[in-house]
């Protein structure tokens, strides 16, 4: 069952839907001097609501970072990811429906010493997680 891999499920969906020119990695961009993107979990509660049957309603915040040599393209791709996920429902391989909503628009973060510019946007992901059956 999908639990801790919500970031992977949502980022893979966005990557395929937009046919991005790079892979969206989890937690970091592996190459320090190349274009890329990553998604990170923002600090958030493990569950918004827990129910007596063991199920729960979960809300997680994800931030997508896009880093590129071309600052304009970095902003554009960050905005495309945001627009694609805003209002989307992503279905995980095990059938979990994840409702996505943009929390922020694409925001400039930094231009590093190598000339790579980073933009980021936050996406809220809500889903109902049924109780586990043993």
Model-derived features: where do they sit?
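Short, charged interaction patches at domain edges and termini
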Residues: 1-12, 44-57, 96-134
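Helix-adjacent hinge/juxtasegments
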Residues: 55-57, 66-69
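Acidic/histidine-rich, surface-exposed loop or edge segments in extracytoplasmic proteins
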Residues: 60
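Small/polar-rich, solvent-exposed N-terminal microdomains that initiate assembly or binding
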Residues: 1-52, 88-93
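Mid-chain, well-packed structural core segment of small domains
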Residues: 67-90
């Amino acid at each position: 069952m999908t639990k801790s891999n919500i970031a992977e499920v949502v980022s893979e969906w966005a990557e395929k839907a937009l046919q991005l020119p790079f892979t969206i990695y989890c937690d970091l961009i592996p190459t320090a001097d190349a274009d890329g993107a990553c998604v990170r979990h923002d600090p958030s509660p493990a569950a918004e609501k827990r129910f007596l049957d063991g199920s729960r309603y979960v809300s997680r915040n994800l931030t997508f970072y896009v880093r590129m040599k071309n600052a304009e393209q970095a902003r554009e791709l960050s905005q495309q990811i945001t627009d694609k996920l805003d209002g989307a429902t992503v279905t995980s391989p095990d059938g979990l429906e994840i409702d996505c909503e943009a929390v922020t628009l694409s925001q400039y973060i930094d231009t590093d010493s190598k000339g790579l510019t980073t933009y980021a946007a936050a996406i809220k992901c809500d889903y109902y997680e049924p109780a586990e059956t043993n």
